[in-house]
């Protein structure tokens, strides 16, 4: 060996991590990857990532060839050692260094910076020197395989890989035949890439013809390379700084200082490289990979919807009636072909989810010290409930080329794209009780027939209640005075006599057409006394009117509280009109022309009309009283001569209730109630008096429908019981028995839910 060769061996340096290959002349199938522990440090840094073998592997991996298989053999020729470094006494016997290298050390000075070390020494000479090695050559065959393509071509990827292994093992026996067969497989399937490698004396006649020095160094387990850090040939005062500079160059790519503290190592970036800790290229690749995985996730769901199993399932679903989520779930569970296809989807999405999680963890680990914060959200798995809702949307919200989402609670579609053309005709609901027995053939949205106990009315099933004409024999709910609201408002303004209800005015505190002081509560009542005078009628109130006159420059604002007794009784058995609440109307105040009088009108209309027997009106006033008048009493005659007091006085010249009377047959209704009462006490069957039960249920429903409004969530007032008590003179026990009998018939025979009511009387 000449001096040039020995000198080259002395200063041969290795730039990165050395991957030890499998045992001599044994095949090796490995998945190349970077150590997870140092992902954020060595990713895209150092010469290792620019080496020929690593770049070749990365390129193949991006093309889908995820598995590498290599078979090789080595030929050792010479064993070389660095005898100069093996000397222990470097002071007496210094290492024979090249003049250029010695000059570079002298240029460093005694306190060099990291950048000086990198530019002067490391970039030129590297970080390690060779202690001992074996010179020789290598002959290798490398195959990159895509198992997914092999699986599609042959049906079994495991058997295909084993067959390729057996074929490659004959490479050193029949090189030409093996390569010819492998090239045929490569061209026909596209699932493998084959590469031959020959280095060292096998491929070259002399050292001068070699492409690189490393091609003659054997790196197997039998022929190990022994390296030593370059700091051993530096003076002692430069050794620590060299190690720090070498680590900064390898781990930080020369863009910062490599620092370790509390078992945590990082790069302290220089000002011109603020992102040295951030492998932006790898982060972009991972973000792109995650985006593709999310697309694959969505495509997996689309593949199921486009599969033959799913399409056949949709065709087998019945279309002659409405399908709820529960009924679709039942059909879903009974379709075995669809279940097997759905299990394949679940296993595929689970594997995809694990890949996404691993990639996301790597992404967030790499971006720990980056200014760039990755924004990634794991795709949500579609639950079985969402699949059933999707089926429902495909059934009813997929029309005219538009699509939408079906809401079962509202039985309607929310169309996408600001249109309402996606909804198909929603079929009727088939079931028990008031559901349809069959949908109409002419219009599938309407009922064609009903269950027993129900009748078909305008495409809907309603209980077979008694005819309205029969109910009219007991109470004449329908009269000639059932005007529309606009007509009622016009008649009230004209004070039409047809709407007058003649009542008796009662008050111990107020006289009509007489001024009084309203600063304290005043009470007045309007009653009919139907129990004595008009026993064959019950009465309906649709409005009220009062004419109130005030003194000039008066600051009073009257305020009314109105209580209504529907069928007589004490004051506690009345209810308060909730003015302005729950949609209830307010008083309307209109001033009369050339007068200090106002017409106060309350129009209930058809929506809020109700029964009444007595109306109690409490009058108060809202005003700011002077300090001297706050402690005065309001009793006694008024003094109109005192100008400081008369501005508070008002008078009521007229109070009128508007409505009409309904004919009421108390004897006939009492006999029907007694029949139900006797049947209940004797334990008789309900069907023996079903017509009477239906009649009383209809009357109770129509009476309670006229109850006053209540707050949301609170039960409605029971006016029917008040009528039984005050107009039919039933006892409390009889009222309870009648209501209980009606409730039992309604729930057990008609299968309808009872409406909760609150006791008033």
From Swiss-Prot:
GO biological-process terms attached to the record: behavioral fear response; brain development; cell population proliferation; cellular response to retinoic acid; central nervous system neuron development; central nervous system neuron differentiation; exploration behavior; gene expression
Record keywords: Cell cycle, Cytoplasm, Glycoprotein, Growth arrest, Neurogenesis, Signal
Short name of any one Pfam family annotated for the protein: MACPF
Keyword Cell cycle: yes
Tissues expressed in: Highly expressed in brain. Weakly expressed in heart, lung, skeletal muscle, kidney, thymus, prostate, testis and small intestine.
Domain MACPF as annotated: residue spans: 68-251
Signal peptide residues on this chain, from the entry's feature table: 1-19
GO-annotated cellular components: cytoplasm; dendrite; glutamatergic synapse; neuronal cell body
Name this protein carries in UniProt: BMP/retinoic acid-inducible neural-specific protein 1
Biological source species: Homo sapiens (Human)
């Amino acid at each position: 060996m000449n001096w040039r060769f020995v000198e080259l061996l002395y200063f041969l340096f290795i730039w990165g991590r050395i991957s030890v290959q499998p045992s001599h002349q044994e095949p090796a199938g490995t998945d190349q990857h970077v150590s997870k522990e140092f992902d954020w440090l060595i990713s895209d840094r150092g010469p290792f990532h620019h080496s020929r073998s690593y770049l070749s592997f990365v390129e193949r991996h991006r093309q889908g060839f995820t598995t590498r298989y290599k078979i090789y053999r080595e030929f050792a020729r010479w064993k070389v050692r660095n005898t100069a470094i093996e000397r222990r006494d470097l002071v007496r016997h210094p290492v024979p260094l090249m003049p250029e290298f010695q000059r570079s050390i002298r240029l460093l000075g005694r306190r060099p910076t990291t950048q000086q070390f990198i530019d002067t020494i490391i970039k030129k000479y590297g970080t390690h020197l060779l202690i001992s090695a074996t010179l020789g050559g290598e002959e290798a065959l490398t195959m990159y395989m895509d198992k997914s393509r092999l699986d599609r071509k042959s049906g079994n990827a495991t058997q295909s890989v084993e067959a390729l292994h057996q074929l490659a093992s004959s490479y050193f026996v029949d090189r030409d035949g093996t390569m010819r067969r492998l090239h045929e497989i490569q061209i026909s399937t596209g699932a493998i890439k084959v590469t031959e490698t020959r280095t060292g004396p096998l491929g070259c006649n002399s050292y001068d013809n070699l492409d690189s020095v490393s091609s003659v160094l054997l790196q197997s387990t039998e022929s190990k390379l022994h390296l030593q850090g370059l700091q051993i040939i530096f003076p002692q005062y430069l050794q620590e700084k060299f190690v720090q500079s070498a680590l900064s160059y390898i781990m930080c790519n020369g863009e910062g200082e490599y620092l370790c503290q509390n078992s945590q190592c990082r790069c302290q970036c220089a000002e011109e490289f603020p992102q040295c800790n951030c492998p932006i290229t790898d982060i972009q690749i991972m973000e792109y990979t995650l985006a593709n995985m999310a697309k694959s996730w969505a495509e997996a769901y689309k593949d199921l919807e486009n599969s033959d199993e799913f399409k056949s399932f949709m065709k087998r679903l019945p279309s002659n009636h409405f399908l709820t989520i529960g009924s679709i779930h039942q059909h879903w569970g009974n379709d075995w072909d669809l279940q097997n296809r759905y299990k394949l989807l679940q296993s595929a999405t689970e594997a995809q989810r694990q890949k996404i999680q691993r990639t996301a963890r790597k992404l967030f680990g790499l971006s720990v010290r980056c200014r760039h914060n990755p924004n990634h959200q794991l795709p949500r798995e579609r639950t079985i409930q969402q699949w059933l809702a999707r089926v429902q949307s495909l059934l009813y919200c997929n029309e005219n080329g538009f699509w939408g989402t079906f809401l079962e609670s509202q039985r309607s579609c929310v169309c996408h794209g600001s249109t309402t053309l996606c909804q198909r005709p929603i079929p009727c609901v088939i079931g028990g009780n008031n559901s349809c027995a069959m949908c109409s053939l002419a219009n599938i949205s309407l009922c064609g027939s009903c269950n027993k106990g129900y009748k078909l009315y305008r495409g809907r099933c309603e209980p077979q209640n008694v005819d309205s004409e029969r109910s009219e024999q007991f109470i004449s709910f329908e009269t000639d005075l059932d005007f529309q609201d606009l007509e009622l408002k016009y008649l009230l303004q004209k004070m039409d006599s047809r709407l007058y209800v003649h009542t008796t005015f009662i008050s111990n505190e107020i006289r009509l057409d007489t001024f009084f002081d309203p600063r304290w509560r005043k009470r007045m009542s309007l009653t009919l006394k139907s129990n004595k005078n008009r026993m064959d009628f019950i009465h309906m109130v649709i409005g009220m009117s009062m004419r109130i006159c005030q003194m000039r420059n008066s600051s009073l604002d009257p305020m009314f509280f109105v209580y209504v007794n529907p069928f007589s009784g004490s004051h506690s058995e009345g209810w308060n009109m909730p003015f302005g609440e729950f949609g209830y109307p307010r008083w309307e105040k209109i001033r009369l022309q050339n007068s200090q009088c106002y017409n106060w009108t309350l129009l209930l209309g058809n929506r809020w009309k109700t029964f009444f027997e007595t109306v109690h009106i409490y009058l108060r006033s809202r005003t700011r009283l002077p300090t001297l008048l706050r402690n005065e009493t309001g009793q006694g005659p008024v003094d109109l001569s005192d100008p400081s007091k008369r501005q508070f006085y008002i008078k009521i010249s007229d109070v009128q209730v508007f409505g009409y009377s309904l004919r009421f047959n108390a004897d006939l209704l009492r006999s029907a109630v007694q029949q139900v009462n006797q049947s209940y006490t004797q334990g008789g069957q309900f069907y023996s008096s079903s017509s009477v039960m239906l009649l009383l249920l209809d009357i109770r429903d129509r009476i309670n429908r006229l109850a006053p409004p209540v707050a949301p969530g609170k039960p409605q007032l029971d006016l029917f019981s008040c009528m039984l008590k005050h107009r039919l003179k039933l006892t409390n026990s009889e009222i309870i028995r009648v209501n209980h009998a009606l409730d039992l018939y309604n729930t057990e025979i008609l299968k309808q839910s009872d409406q909760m009511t609150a006791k008033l009387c």
